[in-house]
Regions:
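Membrane-embedded beta-strand positions in outer-membrane beta-barrel channels/transporters
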Residues: 58-60, 111-113, 173-175, 210-212, ...
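Detector for outer-membrane/organellar transmembrane beta-barrel domains
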Residues: 204-329, 340
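Structural signature of outer-membrane beta-barrel domains
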Residues: 34-38, 80-84, 131-135, 194-196, ...
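Outer-membrane beta-barrel "beta-signal"
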Residues: 328-330, 342, 360-376
Length: 376
């Protein structure tokens, strides 16, 4: 009897060990804080503890289970953090202004999905994720869509007078991702819903669809993406289309980036049209750091019916932005960084560096940040 009991426990241990070997769960995150100083033309300056100057502060959990035959199940839960105050960030539950939450406890605002993937057939995700066009912003903006010099200072700011709920992430989505073994071709397609009643006046609000297709080989990478969201036209929001194309080339002595964005929002009074072009580079400094450079230009081509607060055509509200920074790696997980950015506004434009206060119309905005990032 004793030998039989020992045999049973040994067999159970082998089974548990096999299951454990097929599954994994990882805790990961980033804590990024620094001193941020911004100046708004005609308004003044401010100094604060800035968050996410190099990478967005976050905490997350991800896991996979090997189901055999090349099939895997997985999940990803990732939420933004405000480590300067110990709080989480806001999210949006239905891709509409009505679904916006307030910042507070930790929520998984960045990504929260379950997935099934196969080595030959690709991956299907269900949940919340970044929209297709934002992936281009992450990979082809020299400042990785973070900090005072990020391209988003011009791309999304001032589009309407209301935030775009699907400008970066989307809720209630289903997406398909191509398998990796396609000779350098990669891509994905996504659809999301606002989950409104079919007989509601705003039944289509919050629905969106998009796709991204790219090719990477060696030092070269290029991708194009488009996302279209539906909203009932008002004075501040309407059907929204974002298309972009970007690329990078690593020449060894420097890595070069280019990104072009076109944003259109159909408001009740007319269409907002913004074209933003950005070029930049990473220049390695020995084996421990890199210099980051960028120049971006915004050309506003909105309908003449859309006017500024001063009664002038909005199409004259162009802007330019320069950014320069340096990242110094203390280890694989810890880095020091410094960044400076300046925006020159035209007309009555009030574009602002990230974390700053809007200037008087037509005046400039600038800022610098010095910080430390630690990953785990």
């Amino acid at each position: 009897m004793k030998q039989r009991t020992l045999w049973m426990w040994s067999a159970l241990g082998l089974v548990c060990g096999a299951v454990h070997a097929q599954s994994s769960v990882t805790l990961f995150g980033v804590v990024d804080l620094g001193v941020l100083h911004t100046r708004a033309g005609g308004v003044g300056s401010a100094t604060a503890l800035g968050n996410g100057g190099l990478s967005t502060s976050r905490i997350g959990f991800r896991g996979t289970e090997d189901l055999g035959g090349g099939l895997r199940a997985g999940f990803w839960l990732e939420g933004s953090l405000n480590p300067d105050s110990g709080t989480g960030r806001a999210t949006n539950t239905n891709n509409q202004p009505s679904g916006a939450t307030t910042a507070g406890p930790l929520v998984f605002d960045r990504m929260s999905f379950v997935s099934l993937s196969h080595t030959q057939w690709g991956e299907v995700r269900l949940g919340r994720d970044f929209i297709p066009t934002h992936y281009n912003s992450i990979y082809f903006d020299p400042f990785n869509a973070n900090g005072v010099a990020r391209a988003g200072n011009l791309t999304f700011s001032g589009v309407g007078t209301a935030p775009l709920p699907t400008g970066i992430t989307g809720s209630n989505t289903v997406s398909y991702w191509l398998p990796r073994q396609l000779g350098g071709v990669y891509g994905m397609a996504m659809a999301g819903t606002g989950e409104n009643l079919s007989n509601a006046a705003n039944s289509d609000d919050g629905n969106f669809a998009g796709a991204r297709l790219g090719y990477a080989s060696g030092a070269f990478d290029v991708a194009a993406a488009v996302t279209r969201s539906q909203f009932s036209a008002t004075a501040t929001i309407g059907n929204y289309t974002h298309a972009n194309i970007g690329g990078s080339w690593d020449a060894g002595f420097a890595k070069f980036f280019a990104l072009y964005n076109r944003v259109t929002v159909k408001l009740a009074a007319g269409s907002v049209r913004k074209n933003t072009a950005e070029i930049g580079a990473h220049i390695p400094v020995f084996d421990v750091g890199r210099i980051r450079l960028s120049y971006a230009y915004l050309d506003d081509r909105s309908d003449s019916a859309l006017r500024t607060a001063g009664g002038q055509p909005r199409s004259g509200d162009d802007a330019r932005q320069i950014g320069v920074g340096y990242v110094h790696n203390l280890s694989k997980r810890t880095a020091l960084y410094g960044t400076y950015a300046r925006i020159s506004n035209r007309g009555e434009a009030r574009y602002t560096v990230s974390g700053g206060t809007a200037p008087v119309g037509g005046h400039g905005s600038s800022g610098w940040e010095l910080g430390v990032r630690h990953t785990f």
